[in-house]
Amino acid sequence: MGKEFRKPEGRPVFPKKAVITSGMPYGNKELHFGHVGGLFVHADTFARFMRDRIGAENVIFVSGTDCYGSPILEGFRKQQESGVIPANMTIHDYVEKNHKIQKDTLHAYEIKPDYYGASALYRGAEHHVESSKELFEALYERGQLKMMSTPQFYDPEFKVLLNGRQVVGKCPIEGCCSEKGYADECDLGHQYMPSELIEPKSMLSGKTPEIIEVKNWYFSLENFTDEMQEYINEVRANTNTRKYILNTIEEFLKKPVIYVQKKLIAVNPKTYTGEGAPDKDAFDAAYEAGLAELTAAFPAHEIIAEEKKPSVTFVFASLDDRDKARAALAERNINCRTGKTLVPFRLSGNIEWGVPVPECEGNKDLTFWVWPESLWAPISFTKACLEERGKDPSEWKDWWMGGDAQVYQFIGEDNIYFYGIAEMAMFAAADAEAGKPVKIDYKKLPQIIANRHILFMEKKASSSSEIKPPMAKDLLAFYTPEQLRMHFLSLGLSTKSSSFKPQIYLPENEREGVDPVLKEGNLLTNVFNRIVRSCLYTVQKYNDSVIPMGVVDEKIKAASEEAILEYERHMYNHDFHRITYVLDDYIRLLNKHYANNIKKAEEEGGEALRDQLLTDCFYGIKTALLLLHPIAPTGCETVREYVGLSEKVYDWNYAFADMKDVLANPNGETKFLPPRFDFFLRHESQLAEMQEK
């Protein structure tokens, strides 16, 4: 076995330990198709592969329900008011109910985290309070936190401070096309201060809220621009992190800017005395006068004024300078938009439902804002998982920061700012030696795997948008988990946004051809089923159900090794759609090899040719099982049982081994296969439809 597993040149190197995380769904809802198809299937497939590749004991796959935050509070309030949930239900019971439904849905999709926790529930919640305290104190002791008085929305009608999604307006970031801007972030992940939100409305009263000053803890993220740029340069040069992720991060590493429309500068009330907008002939003079006045009023800055662009860009050295310029514009009733840059990252809030912030400098009764605490929640879940394994929870550091370990975090592209910037700077700062410069070392930090949007019928669908996504569990009334897993992986979310277009959601008169959701699954339910059945029926008929142990044809062996290495490379790069291409090519090659030779063997009565064919094809089935196991585990287990293979067939130490090395029965005996047997099943609704046709 050892000599079989020699590494060819250029083969990817995997860590000895791996933590895989998947983005946490909110505790106010069930899982919709985007949660499962856009993230969880990818994370689970990679986790299953890593268990096979480096050993299950060396892999921890965690995720959980995001229990806190304004979306959960709002969901709870609305459902109680509308009578969807009982009036006496507590918010704790509310998130626990949704957590259990989420967990059941993941199980139904054969998604198997080692620990699926909840930030407010069970033992994981206890670890989460501890992790939150540890990180806060580490950052505070290293001088990375500051108490800031910042504006917050207040609804005078309801007499409450408004958080997160209790306020909706337009994102102030130049060029942003998000549907909704919330209190201090938009639904595309842009960060800004509440006072920057354009046309805010309270979700409680529907009226424009007031702004009052409140105190909160902030992490000094704005000080890490240079360190983040150095980190990005190293990640770009030394890792396989997706380039668009790095490009997205770099967009935020720019100096603070504001954009002001030229037509607004021209009517600067400090310089313009006319009525209405200046006409074309007078515009240039009015614009130049207004610009000169602003230039004198602003702190030191650079001006970018391109002739063909309708706005002027003012570039500042610091956020303070930018905000002084914004104040000067506000004094003149001139609107502006801001650009992407690093801003202080809020850690605390004032809603009661949250993880408590340690009392510090006399500030008490604060809770952590949901976004930062959800970044370290996977650490809390790792602690809980280790504890369940009988290990010391303090070993989490070996898994998250050990030299032989790697953390892989599967997220959606809208959350790159939080995971790719705020998390990296916070984790590095908390681990730094007090009083020393912070080095954001990519070798001690997670690798971010951000998928693009999964659309529904070519449109972006989410629980908070006009187009509502189908619930994940509802899809299982029409498709099997394995069919959906194959299809979701094939969508190519590593490179582009792709649309999920199940025909069952189309009117019957609009349905044409084969349902696209079934295309990849047909490789299993048609082609692979056929080759496995054919081989088993043939050994039953001619070989007393015993697999012949000959020498595998060189072409089949070479094709198998090529498929293994190509698959491994794509899995290393998290290019899941390319994995489906490898599987399609390889399994169809096996099927063609069998079909082209079995007839010849039977016509010529060639026992030797038939045995050679069976030797080749069973070796191919062994290889296909290794590659399919992370994607379609149940069907693979059924094949393994009937072919008579041990669990070594899934172990990458045996990837290039001979057939005899992975047999459950040394003599190669297979299990009797009844007629018309399927290993990979179609959904019963599909069978009924086939019978009708």
Predicted regions and their residues:
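Cys/His-rich microdomains that often coordinate metals
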Residues: 162, 178-181, 192-193, 208-211
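Structural preference for alpha-helix termini/caps and helix-kink/transition segments
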Residues: 35, 462-463, 468-693
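A charged helix-plus-loop insertion that forms the helical arch/lid used to bind
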Residues: 75-96
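Structured secondary-structure scaffolds
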Residues: 2-56, 60-63, 67, 130, ...
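Structured alpha-helical segments in the cores of large, soluble enzyme domains
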Residues: 94-106, 419
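Short, charge-patterned binding micro-sites
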Residues: 65-71, 75
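A broadly conserved sequence feature marking short terminus-proximal activation segments
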Residues: 101-182, 225, 229-237, 252
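Basic, alpha-helical terminal appendages of large translation-related enzymes
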Residues: 1-15, 148-153, 166-190, 200-204, ...
